Amino acid sequence: MYAVVVTGGKQYKVTEGDVLFVEKLDAEVDAAIELDNVLAISKDNGEFVVGKPVVEGAKVTAKVLKQGKAKKVVVFKYKPKKHYRKKQGHRQPYTKIQIEKINA
């Protein structure tokens, strides 16, 4: 059984036990969260349900494992012959979650 869920503006295909890195969620570590934007579900009997736009009554339960920041990305801008140099770094915050249960 798998589901397609939306969180942080991105879509993820998840099964029970999967570990994901998603955009930062406002939740404490070891907290249980519910992802209720389920676009599609594939059941064990081969049935495939597609929502319009979401599947009614479906939700995915997950556990927050970690809050953190990704590796630094360096942004370097320059203009040739003008002595313009600008170096900037960015670290995107993320939440590491583990999918516990898919309710269809």
Curated annotation (Swiss-Prot):
Pfam families: Ribosomal_L21p. GO terms for cellular component: cytoplasm; ribonucleoprotein complex; ribosome. One of its GO terms (biological process) is translation. InterPro entries: bL21-like, bL21-like_sf, Ribosomal_bL21, Ribosomal_bL21_CS. Keywords: Ribonucleoprotein, Ribosomal protein, RNA-binding, rRNA-binding. GO terms for molecular function: rRNA binding; structural constituent of ribosome. PANTHER family: 50S RIBOSOMAL PROTEIN L21, LARGE RIBOSOMAL SUBUNIT PROTEIN BL21M. Part of the 50S ribosomal subunit. Contacts protein L20. This protein binds to 23S rRNA in the presence of protein L20. Belongs to the bacterial ribosomal protein bL21 family. This is Large ribosomal subunit protein bL21. It comes from Clostridium tetani (strain Massachusetts / E88).
